Amino acid sequence: MIFKNLISLFFIGLATAIRFNLTDLECSRLRGPHCGTYLLKVVGTNATYVGEKSFIGLDALTESKGEFFQRMLEQEPRLIPRLFTIAENDTANFTPLTFTTYLKTCNPQSIENAMIPFVNTVTSEISFDAWAYTAQNSSRITGLSNQLMNSTLYNVQVATCTPGFSALLLDSPTINVFNNEEGMPSWCQPIELIPVCPLDEGFN
C-alpha cells in the first residue's frame, strides 16, 4: 500500500517519542526466576496486548482451492498475512504474541513472526517488513525483535498508527517502528510496552 507524498503532509503534527528498554526481566512463574516467556502489554491499559491479526490476501481469494491449499501447506507468508497490532485479548481475529528471552542476559531474543509496517522516509510511503530491518535509511540492525524491545539502545521509536487502509482492513491500529531522526505523522501515537507473565494475565 503506497501513500506517496502523503507522509510529508502529516509531518506538521509531530509526537514525542517514548523510549524504553526491556532488560533484566523477571517472571518467576515461568522457566526460572528471571528468564522466560512473556506477553507485551501496553502501558496504561488493563488488557491491551501486542499481537497480530490475520487476513486472506486478494490473490488467494481469486485462485483455485488446490493452489490455495498448496500455498497453505508450504506456509507461504503472503497467503494469509499477519499484521502487527495492539488489541484486547477478546478481540476477534486477534492473537497476543509471546516473546522469549536469552538465557544468559534475560534480554528479549525472539518474537513470533508477523509483518510490521513502518514509514519509509526515503520513498515517502508506508512499507512492510517481516522482522528484518526498520527502513532503508536505518542503520540496518538485524533482529527487529530487539530493536522494538530495546528502542533506546537502537535509537528507534515505537508508535501505534492508524492510516486509512489499516482502519478499513483490520479495524485496528498498526505498530510502527521509526528511526530516531524521523518525525511521527499526526496519525501516530508513541506507546510504551511492559513485559507481563502470561499466567499472571490469565493465559495458560
UniProtKB/Swiss-Prot annotation:
Induction: By zinc depletion. Belongs to the VEL1 family. The keyword Cytoplasm applies. It comes from Schizosaccharomyces pombe (strain 972 / ATCC 24843) (Fission yeast). InterPro entries: Vel1-like. It holds the Pfam family Vel1p. Residues 1-17 form the signal peptide. The keyword Zinc applies. One of its GO terms (cellular component) is cytosol. It is found in: Cytoplasm, Cytosol. This is VEL1-related protein AC977.05c. Keywords: Cytoplasm, Signal, Zinc.
